[in-house]
């Protein structure tokens, strides 16, 4: 009984002391600031949960619909629906259309559709060849295939038939039924409130260090995101989940930049605007596959020029010679080359069977690795190599070959590290940062980042209130720790979960991809997002060696921000949901067609 009495007495004393504590807080020099931060930290979490979970759940619930585009009649009895724009015809089980006849080669030919609905057949050097309406088709040459034409594959006759009007109606209905698009307006309002409250919090946290660049930058990103959504809604687009996630992460980027480098925040906003511009341009360009493939040689040339400029004129920073100074700007060309690497590495179905195409990409990859080795950029080289493995596997499907390449590269990497003292020092300190000989030396950054992460707790100290922001590279390499300290573990985890969701959605989009080009591009961009996030987060926590890799959309840095928006364009191009992506032309989705047709 005495124990219960003491407990209730303690509770009464606690609540009785609250008014006095609040009064003392308001009387203190920063009374309003302390009260605002105390409440704002919880409101930030609620807003972040609403913004991100609303978009995340929409992406995870949505299905990229699988549609029937035509039928291929094989022999007298078999009728196969064509559910992709690119199909391999052959005897092998892995073919999109399997023809069980010994006169048909394992991979006999390809049947592809373009934006205008025209189907084309290309023979892949099959043993018994192919003919169209009695005319022999030359190996590796394309011919147009019309409805009712007789296509002979070996001794098997095939005929292409269009879908009926009723089936076309059903396609449109099913697409609309499978598409779950949430209204962007509540999320935009919540994100706007988040941005306004962040500005107030930065005023409180930074004090005299606060400047008008911060106000202008947050006003700019607010206007930018509203303008983007309004313009796209005017174009009859309704799916904005990916962009809202990216705008939220970009808002955090402005916040961490303002916290660490208040005088650089406007420059960071400009790169966000440039990134959105690049995203819009790439999505518009990628919607036309032939046009996308035609400029591959131009993209190759630009990538080579960027690498050569970096090798010749680059200057060393943090152990890597991967920066170029142009006036007052410092850029990292390798971030932009990631986009080129995916652009030229992705391939349409016809290109997958061209040895010349594969050889050129392999030579370019070796050239890229060589340049990155000269620049001593271990983190970027690792990302490029993982992307190369992903692209190579998706292009060939040969897992054994990929394992051999990875094994040889791992051995070569270990040998190379022996000659790179800076990189080797990071490897040696890995897992031992708390040892006396490392804690204030090569382990300095990681021990401080882990300490700051722990001090943030679940809700954080408040933007501009942390101490890690004063440490070197806190806004780039250690940004996960900075976000955890100032914004809390909950928002930091949501930040990671947002990247994971983009990747999961890209993976689910593969099944309904219009072309292998978009599938390979989306998977490659997904792998870069995932691997960069993993290296940044785990490097900060000493689970992986610290590589200096940025967190997508969040880390400060112009080229990193621009490249992140560019990578998002590859994911957006794989989104075939009804009205969701302007990377897909309206006529390909049944938009504008009345249900009665």
Task: Give residue spans per PLM region.
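Intrinsically disordered, low-complexity acidic Ser/Thr-rich regulatory segments
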Residues: 2-102, 114-115, 164-174
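Loop-to-helix entry and N-terminal half of a specific, functionally important transmembrane alpha helix
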Residues: 509-548, 554
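A structural signal for hydrophobic alpha-helical transmembrane segments in multi-pass membrane proteins
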Residues: 173-318, 562-576, 580-589
């Amino acid at each position: 009984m005495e124990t219960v009495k003491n407990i209730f007495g303690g509770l009464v004393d606690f609540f009785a002391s609250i008014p006095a504590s609040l009064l003392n807080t308001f009387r203190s020099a920063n009374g309003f600031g302390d009260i605002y931060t105390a409440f704002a930290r919880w409101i930030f979490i609620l807003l972040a949960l609403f913004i991100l979970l609303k978009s995340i759940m929409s992406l995870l619930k949505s299905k990229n619909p699988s549609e029937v585009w035509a039928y291929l009649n094989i022999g007298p009895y078999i009728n196969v629906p064509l559910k992709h724009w690119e199909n391999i015809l052959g005897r092998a089980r892995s073919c999109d259309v399997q023809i069980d006849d010994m006169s048909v080669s394992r991979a006999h030919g390809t049947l592809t559709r373009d934006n205008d609905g025209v189907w084309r057949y290309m023979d892949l050097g099959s043993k018994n060849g192919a003919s169209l309406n009695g005319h022999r088709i030359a190996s590796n040459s394309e011919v147009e295939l019309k409805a009712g034409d007789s296509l002979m594959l070996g001794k098997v006759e095939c005929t292409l038939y269009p879908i009926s009007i009723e089936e076309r109606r059903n396609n449109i209905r099913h697409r609309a039924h499978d598409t779950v698009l949430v209204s962007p307006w509540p999320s935009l309002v919540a994100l706007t409130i988040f941005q306004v409250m962040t500005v107030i919090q930065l005023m409180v946290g930074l004090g005299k260090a606060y400047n008008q660049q911060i106000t202008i930058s947050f006003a700019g990103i607010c206007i930018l995101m509203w303008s983007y959504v309004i313009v796209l809604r005017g174009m009859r687009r309704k799916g904005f989940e990916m962009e809202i996630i990216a705008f939220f992460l970009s808002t955090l980027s402005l916040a961490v930049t303002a916290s660490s480098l208040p005088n650089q925040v406007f420059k960071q906003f400009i790169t966000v605007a440039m990134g959105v511009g690049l995203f819009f341009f790439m999505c518009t360009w990628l919607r036309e596959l032939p046009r996308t493939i035609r400029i591959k040689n131009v993209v190759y040339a630009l990538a080579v020029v960027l690498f050569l400029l970096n090798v010749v004129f680059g200057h060393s920073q943090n152990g890597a010679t991967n920066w170029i100074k142009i006036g007052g700007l410092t850029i990292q060309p390798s971030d932009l080359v990631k986009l080129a690497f995916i652009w030229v590495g992705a391939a349409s179905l016809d290109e997958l069977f061209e040895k010349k195409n594969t050889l050129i990409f392999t030579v370019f990859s070796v050239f890229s690795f060589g340049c990155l080795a000269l620049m001593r950029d271990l983190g970027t080289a690792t990302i490029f190599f993982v992307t190369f493995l992903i692209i190579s596997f998706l292009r060939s499907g040969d897992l054994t070959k990929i394992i051999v390449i990875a094994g040889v590269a791992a051995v070569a990497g270990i040998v190379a590290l022996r000659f790179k003292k800076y990189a080797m020092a990071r490897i040696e300190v890995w897992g031992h940062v708390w040892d006396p000989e490392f804690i204030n030396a090569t382990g300095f950054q990681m021990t401080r980042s882990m300490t700051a992460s722990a001090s943030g707790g679940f809700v954080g100290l408040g933007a501009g209130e942390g101490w890690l922001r004063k440490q070197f590279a806190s806004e780039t390499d250690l940004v996960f720790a900075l976000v955890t300290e100032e914004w809390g573990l909950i928002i930091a985890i949501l930040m990671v979960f947002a990247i994971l969701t983009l990747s999961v959605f890209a993976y689910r989009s593969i099944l309904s991809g219009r072309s292998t080009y978009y599938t390979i591009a989306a998977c490659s961009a997904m792998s870069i997002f995932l691997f960069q996030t993993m290296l940044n987060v785990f490097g900060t926590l000493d689970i992986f060696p610290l590589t200096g890799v940025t967190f997508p959309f969040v880390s400060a840095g112009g080229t990193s921000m621009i490249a992140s928006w560019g990578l998002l364009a590859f994911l957006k191009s794989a989104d075939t949901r009804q009205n969701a992506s302007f990377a897909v032309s309206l006529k390909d989705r049944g938009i504008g067609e009345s249900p009665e047709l």
